[in-house]
């Protein structure tokens, strides 16, 4: 679980858009950039080189 205060101040380093926490995958997802940032040992890894691209299905799911 990620601290809600931390989540409220973190933004995607690529798009500067807000992030959504996905607990079952332990990732922070940015719908705007289509990237998912991993959380390792409770620490968000906010590097573009460490992020994975969202699938088309995921992009549709997270673009509210």
Swiss-Prot record:
| UniProt-listed HAMAP family | UPF0434
UniProt cross-references to SUPFAM superfamilies, sorted A to Z = Trm112p-like
The protein depicted here goes by the name UPF0434 protein TERTU_2813
Q: Gene3D superfamilies from the xrefs? A: 2.20.25.10
Q: In terms of domain of life, where is this protein from?
A: Bacteria
- InterPro entries in UniProt: Trm112-like (IPR005651)
Family, as annotated: Belongs to the UPF0434 family.
Q: Among the entry's GO cellular component annotations, what is one?
A: cytosol
Q: Pfam families this protein is in?
A: Trm112p
């Amino acid at each position: 679980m990620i601290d809600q205060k931390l989540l409220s101040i973190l933004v995607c380093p690529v798009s500067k858009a807000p992030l959504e926490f996905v607990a079952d995958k332990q990732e922070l997802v940015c719908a705007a950039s289509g990237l998912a940032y991993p959380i390792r040992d409770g620490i968000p890894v906010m590097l573009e080189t460490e992020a994975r691209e969202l699938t088309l299905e995921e992009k549709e799911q997270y673009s509210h």
